Amino acid sequence: MKRPLTAIAAGLLAAGSLAAAAFAGPSFDADGKLVIPDQRDRWPMVGATYALSYEGDGGVTINTVRMDPESYDACVKTGKFPVGTMLDLEVRRPAEEVAPAKGGKTQGAAVGRSLHVKDEKAGPGTWTFYGYAAGAKTGNPIPRSQACYSCHDQHAGTTDTVFMQFYPSLKEAREVAVKPKS
């Protein structure tokens, strides 16, 4: 009886180690490109927006943001985004008249993806945006001259240039975790 229990315990420990290793923060190839993590669709969703427009005539989109599980847990516990945090943005066009629905919109074709990574490449506390195509294995850093950086710097508030107003469930979870004890 002891051996089967030992084997089960060892198996569970190994499975836990593999799960933790799957989300060990960002990694980069020899050219400095971000290696796109697998199974991002399993990451906790922290926000979704509809018809949010950044650039004027980009068309209506449904945007979904997911966060790597290790950083999510750390952020909820401490109220801070640890170095290595990855936020995955998926941008899709809305689809209409999808049977059997009689109205409304659902997610349609993907039109863009990017990862916002707290990698501190430009100094302490900084994040880098990495763009990538569907099915890509690596993502290229988006130049810091692009508007996404200045917009996040100017409008995201004091939370690591992350738009917490778009992620109410994450914001609420952080507030509960870091609430002063009375």
Tell where the protein language model's regions lie, with residue ranges.
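C-terminal segment of classical bacterial N-terminal signal peptides
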Residues: 14-22
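Sequence context surrounding c-type heme c attachment/ligation sites in exported
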Residues: 25-59, 78-182
